[in-house]
Regions:
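Non-catalytic structural scaffold of enzyme domains
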Residues: 1-10, 14-243
Length: 243
């Protein structure tokens, strides 16, 4: 059954309760899918729609926005929302999703571990693999503290998978999240870019949250700055096309 306040995209799949949003018009296309995307902010929906239109035309996306999952995970820890995440995934599968892409790094590990019956992917895993390939010195930037530990663990997991040594440092971008919560996405991106440009002695800079992706194009550092939406959606598209 669906989690409280969750709502799946697509006709007839609307859930009950406040605090969530379903995919809007234009999320359906004639082609592979559907790929369900689990978001914790409605601001992610147009980002992934644009990436789909640019690189994966014909891929059907269904957006599930459950904002309370991040709020609770930040205050109580990601494991506190494991049951609700699983309920949202079960609803997505019942509504026909062939795979689910979790776009929230804080709850990504919880989502990935759920036995949902279809592939469940973390949007940040391809980014973490790219960071490991870039070199051993990886700096993880996040705007919320709850994202740091899961992202560090993911980078270390990808390093182990690749048989590489990695030294991960973290930077919490103080004050940036308040811009995002206020709807000032430009101010948010600028704050993240400034923090990225201040990083030294790194082979790769990881923007831990999908919401940070616009900052990637504002940085001036010669160090590779990696974000998750584009490679994450590509991984999801590959899975549904192969299924």
């Amino acid at each position: 059954m669906s989690a409280p306040g969750s709502r799946a995209g697509g006709p007839g799949s609307r859930g009950s309760g406040p605090g969530s949003r379903a995919s809007g018009p234009g999320s359906r296309a004639s082609g592979p899918g559907p790929l369900a995307l689990l978001h914790t902010s409605p601001l992610h929906v147009p980002v992934f729609e644009a990436l789909r239109d640019e690189a994966h035309q014909g891929l059907e996306l269904r957006h599930l926005v459950v904002e309370e999952l991040l709020a609770r995970a930040r205050s109580e820890g990601p494991e506190a929302v494991a049951d609700d995440v699983r309920a949202v995934l079960d609803r997505a599968v019942a509504d026909g999703a062939r795979a689910v892409l979790c776009t929230c790094s804080t709850i990504g590990a919880v989502a990935e571990r759920a036995a949902a019956g279809v592939p469940v992917l973390r949007v940040d895993r391809p980014m973490a693999a790219a960071a490991v390939a870039a070199g051993p010195r990886v700096v993880v930037l996040a705007a919320v503290h709850s994202t740091l530990e899961p992202t560090v663990a993911l980078v270390e997991e990808e390093a182990l998978r690749a048989g590489r040594r990695v030294d991960v440092r973290t930077v919490l971008v103080d004050g940036a999240w308040s811009f995002f919560e206020a709807g000032d996405t430009d101010g948010y991106a600028r704050a993240v870019a400034v923090a990225a440009d201040a990083v030294t002695d790194a082979d790769a800079i990881v923007l831990a949250q999908a919401s940070m992706a616009p900052a990637q194009h504002l940085t001036t550092t010669p160090t590779p700055v990696l974000s998750s939406p584009r490679p994450g959606l590509a991984a999801g598209a590959d899975v549904v096309c192969a299924s």
